[in-house]
UniProtKB/Swiss-Prot annotation:
Lineage: Bacteria, Bacillati, Cyanobacteriota, Cyanophyceae, Acaryochloridales
Secretion signal span: none
Recorded GO MF terms: DNA binding; DNA-directed RNA polymerase activity
GO biological process entries: DNA-templated transcription
Any one of the GO CC terms: DNA-directed RNA polymerase complex
Protein name stated in the entry: DNA-directed RNA polymerase subunit omega
Oligomeric form and interacting partners: In cyanobacteria the RNAP catalytic core is composed of 2 alpha, 1 beta, 1 beta', 1 gamma and 1 omega subunit. When a sigma factor is associated with the core the holoenzyme is formed, which can initiate transcription.
Annotated family: Belongs to the RNA polymerase subunit omega family.
Reactions it catalyzes: RNA(n) + a ribonucleoside 5'-triphosphate = RNA(n+1) + diphosphate
InterPro entries: DNA-dir_RNA_pol_omega, Pol_omega/Rpo6/RPB6, RPB6/omega-like_sf
Gene field: rpoZ
The protein's role, per its UniProt record: Promotes RNA polymerase assembly. Latches the N- and C-terminal regions of the beta' subunit thereby facilitating its interaction with the beta and alpha subunits.
Organism of this sequence: Thermosynechococcus vestitus (strain NIES-2133 / IAM M-273 / BP-1)
Keywords: DNA-directed RNA polymerase, Nucleotidyltransferase, Transcription, Transferase
Record carries keyword Transferase: yes
Amino acid sequence: MQKRLHYSSLEINRRAEELIQHSANRYRITVQIANRAKQRRGLEASEDLDDLPLKPVIRAIIEMSDEVAQPELLADS
């Protein structure tokens, strides 16, 4: 059984705002978050949804906010 990770809604909001502030285009960063979440959901489709520690969108926000220090990772591929 996986350990559940808990982030407060305030922490998620802070990270999302941080992403938006560091992005030149609010729409583009929103689409990038959605695309990463969609990819993550596809990778985890075979797993039981009750065992997932975080929803894909929240995980995408957390991962991308951690990558803000490396802006080249946020660039379009």
